[in-house]
Amino acid sequence: MDKFRVQGPTCLSGEVTISGAKNAALPILFAAILAEEPVELTNVPKLKDIDTTIKLLNRLGTKVERNGSVFVDARHINEFCAPYELVKTMRASIWALGPLVARFGRGQVSLPGGCAIGARPVDLHITGLEQLGAEITLDEGYVKARVDGRLKGAHIVMDKVSVGATITIMTAAVLAEGKTIIENAAREPEIEDTANFLNTLGAKISGAGTDSITIEGVERLGGGTYQILPDRIETGTFLVAAAVSRGRVVCRNAKPDTLDAVLAKLREAGADIETGEDWISLDMHGKRPKAVTLRTAPHPGFPTDMQAQFSLLNLVADGAGMITETIFENRFMHIPELIRMGAHAEIESNTVLCHGVDKLSGAQVMATDLRASASLVLAGCIAEGTTIVDRIYHIDRGYENIEAKLQGLGAKIERLHSND
């Protein structure tokens, strides 16, 4: 199993080019199942989860080629089951179900895996598909969906805000008969990006990015070319990297308007931030960040996927800051690892109180999930001595070539292969 060896402390400074958004690329790849003509996707990140999705699409009979762009040809799908061996590492595979049942009248997906951060039930996905007329059964670890004829448009009020279920319902409703309205929909930029992609193919979706999405069902989708939006979480991670190391970074191929809550907290922490149409710069002018208090919330609130990085910021900041996690349970697994490096923190239920320390010390730590692993790597960059980050397969699921990008900012980081 690969590890990172990081030598610190380092002041991280320079430019970094942001990759396409994993959380948009995944639903868009699955939504391409709906297309009856070939699709070309650009700015698709090179990640483990993307590779797994491509394998899964190929298993279904979709022809997928990666040659700079990703080309998806779903004209000859002949298999309607996403099997356990491909699904077990990635919860996003549930997004195959809506497009399969919408276009072909049937589909089945093994109950998904992914990060070990609390309960992520598929109930909301199932309820939404049932409201569109699908018959759902759970059998031997598989979610199976069927419908005779086309799905039927419906007025769906979601019990709670869910990014995943919003995407499932939206992609299924595109080919449904009549109009679907999703109330209490998630508002994340990646949902808007998925809707924009589908509209490029001929869908009629309006309101994506708000809490009320309207889908006028169409009979078929064609092909087209679409560029995935930049990854706001990767952008935020590199901004925090500069903030905790008292450095300066310019993020290119970024989308500042997807990061309002994060940029506000970084400014509160003392960062000097400037933005352009497709770039963000952060400069700490050599100063230590100030601790901030924040609460995660659905978009446009503070993103849960930036919580671990801001935990690190607070743990090396001037003062004390409180972080409350409202989206997922069990998402402070990075805190005990950071305490091994000399951090001072107390966890009480879904809140962590962070007391800033002057310095961290290198240690052997273990990544537990995708974003937690990023915070441990950044901690290694600023800690005195050597840090070994174990189980970095988590980080490869969500960050493209992170060690090369950090090296470009001056980090002393290397990947140790399991046979090294």
Swiss-Prot record:
SUPFAM superfamilies: EPT/RTPC-like. It catalyses: phosphoenolpyruvate + UDP-N-acetyl-alpha-D-glucosamine = UDP-N-acetyl-3-O-(1-carboxyvinyl)-alpha-D-glucosamine + phosphate. Phosphoenolpyruvate binds at residues 22-23. UDP-N-acetyl-alpha-D-glucosamine binds at residues 91, 120-124, 160-163, 305, 327. Signal peptide: none annotated. GO terms for molecular function: UDP-N-acetylglucosamine 1-carboxyvinyltransferase activity. NCBIfam families: murA, PRK09369.1. This is UDP-N-acetylglucosamine 1-carboxyvinyltransferase. It comes from Proteus mirabilis (strain HI4320).
